[in-house]
Amino acid sequence: MEIILFLTMMVMITYVFSGYLYRVALVQSSRVDLIFTRFENMCFKIIGTDLEHMSAKTYVKHFLAFNGFMGFITFVLLIVQQWLFLNPNHNLNQSIDLAFNTAISFLTNSNLQHYNGESDVTYLTQMIVMTYLMFTSSASGYAVCIAMLRRLTGLTNIIGNFYQDIVRFIVRVLLPLSCLISILLMTQGVPQTLHANLMIRTLSGHIQHIAFGPIASLESIKHLGTNGGGFLAGNSATPFENPNIWSNFIEMGSMMLLPMSMLFLFGRMLSRHGKRVHRHALILFVAMFFIFIAILTLTMWSEYRGNPILANLGIYGPNMEGKEVRFGAGLSALFTVITTAFTTGSVNNMHDSLTPLGGLGPMVLMMLNVVFGGEGVGLMNLLIYVLLTVFICSLMVGKTPEYLNMPIGAREMKCIVLVFLIHPILILVFSALAFMIPGASESITNPSFHGISQVMYEMTSAAANNGSGFEGLKDDTTFWNISTGIIMLLSRYIPIILQLMIASSLVNKKSYHQDKYTIAIDKPYFGVSLIVFIVLLSGLTFIPVLLLGPIGEFLTLK
């Protein structure tokens, strides 16, 4: 009952919050201008931008240059961190390959962590590298999505200014909400301090070091920005990051807030005036929510069913291996599905200990990579499936392939197919390399089907820019650091470039008349068609390898 109430409340909150995002996205005046405008102007002066409207090509260039500069600075800081200040625990520099992986991971909003948060980063790099990139990577994804939506919806004839979009989103959305969430988490017991690790004497007389630090400030943007990288190695399974059931709901709600609001924002932009949400966006929302609930149901059923091997021994009950007692199987399964659907990657239980079908659910969500998804890019990925569905359905019934009165031609379809293929190609090719390259497979700690699942999950998480993992995998090696770094880099930037190209290409040949020979995209059957095509296309791509992994493991457990 508490899960139903929570999900219902989040739908209502995101619907209302999308109205505020609408004013932020379209640079409309609001009551908070007096508070934020001066700070924004100061940021614009520091950046040196004159807020001129950019072409699509210029927008992408600045997006890539901004991200490239941040990535370089991050890499340098990680390989020299031991000689910098705010290092009371005397942590050492990261190796070149680990720093490469870490920098790309946080730059691309993935937060895949091959390092140990307690010993491999300092307080300085936690704050000015990890936390900073959590803000900017999230805002970058939002900015390119808003640029795409402005062109597709035809609300304006401009794409906008990259620096204006990113600064407004950080100042008006991320910073205020992060401060609020940090305070809420601190009230629940999440620490925020710059003191060195606690050193205590245990009952047995031994000395134990307890790691903590500025956790609350990172924890807030970690979930709000769908980042996922934990301050501690145990992530949100540790009491310092996620002390109780209330902090658990705060973190889950933070993950869902902005991606769900973005879909409603799209609907408000389609309705022109922003006071209501267009039916097309509502159809998309219901379709994605249906897939979300279906995967959640499968995961919860599997986790509550428990391990059949233990049942044969007379031990019944839910699967509690790798789970925190304070959350139980239900809230652990909900957190797992939310963190993979919204591509956050934080965990409040160990995914490597999930039942086979319990692990299948989050893996499928990352393979689909469209069920709400991360900040901005999730909606962009969904729109690729929407365009693909419109094109196929139109040809099947002999109608003109058009989306929002824009004809979909051969040029757009080539880009759409490329975007669709990048994701599975990266996952499948690099998974195969993990078994072929000498030494790479030595990181696998489980035999047979589960070992394949470990590899598939790691590569899928990197390709989906998620960051969670089956942490039984010993992934801090040169192969895994470099390979997943390359995957995260390619899967983030190539689709974004192609998606903006698609939007610009469609707008450049826009027809402003309503063609009666096009399919209706605001009817329930379009939502059903979208679900069918998502399942069919992804199923045909990934079912063979899933049979070798979680499905095969499920069939062998008796």
UniProtKB/Swiss-Prot annotation:
Keywords: Cell membrane, Ion transport, Membrane, Potassium, Potassium transport, Transmembrane, Transmembrane helix, Transport. GO terms for cellular component: plasma membrane. It is found in: Cell membrane. The chain crosses the membrane at residues 1-21, 66-86, 127-147, 166-186, 245-265, 281-301, 327-347, 354-374, 377-397, 416-436, 482-502, 531-551. It is a multi-pass membrane protein. GO terms for molecular function: P-type potassium transmembrane transporter activity; potassium ion binding. It comes from the Bacteria. The keyword Transport applies. Its main location: membrane. Belongs to the KdpA family. The system is composed of three essential subunits: KdpA, KdpB and KdpC. Part of the high-affinity ATP-driven potassium transport (or Kdp) system, which catalyzes the hydrolysis of ATP coupled with the electrogenic transport of potassium into the cytoplasm. This subunit binds the extracellular potassium ions and delivers the ions to the membrane domain of KdpB through an intramembrane tunnel. This is Potassium-transporting ATPase potassium-binding subunit. It comes from Staphylococcus aureus (strain MSSA476). The gene is kdpA.
